[in-house]
Amino acid sequence: MWDLFYFKVFFWVVLISLCIFMVHRNGKVANKFRELRSRFQSRFNRHISLNDSFTDDLESGLHSSNFDIISENNNDTRGGLDDISKNEIKQIMEMNNISFDKARLLYMERKFGQNGIAPDGTPIDPKAFTFD
C-alpha cells in the first residue's frame, strides 16, 4: 500500500518538474502565461502596466515573444505601430496565414525595397560604396 502511495507522489513530482522545465525552456509557453495573466488582470479591473498605445496592439494580436509589449513599458514614451502599418501587417498575417514575426519581417522587407534597400539591409544602388 505504501509502495503505491510513494509511486503516486513520485509520479506527480516528476510530472510537475517536467512542466516547470518546459515552461522555463520554451519562451513561447512563458509568453502565453504572461498574456493569460494580463487578460485575467484586465477582466478583474486590475492595472496592467502598458503604455496606452500598446494596449490595442496587444488585443489585436500584434505581439510575440520577440516583440514583447507585455513587459513593463509604462515609462516608454514611444508609440506603437502607426495605423497604416498595423493594417498592412494584419492583412499580411491573414492572407499568408503566418505569425506576427514573419508578417512584420515581410512588411519591413517590402518597405526596404521601396526605399532602395535589399532585404539583407545593403543598398541596392550600384553606385553605393560599403565597408566590409
UniProtKB/Swiss-Prot annotation:
This is UPF0357 protein YCL012C. Coiled coil: none annotated. InterPro entries: DUF2015. The lineage of its organism: Eukaryota, Fungi, Dikarya, Ascomycota, Saccharomycotina. It comes from Saccharomyces bayanus. It holds the Pfam family DUF2015. Belongs to the UPF0357 family. The keyword Transmembrane does not apply. Keywords: Signal. Residues 1-25 form the signal peptide.
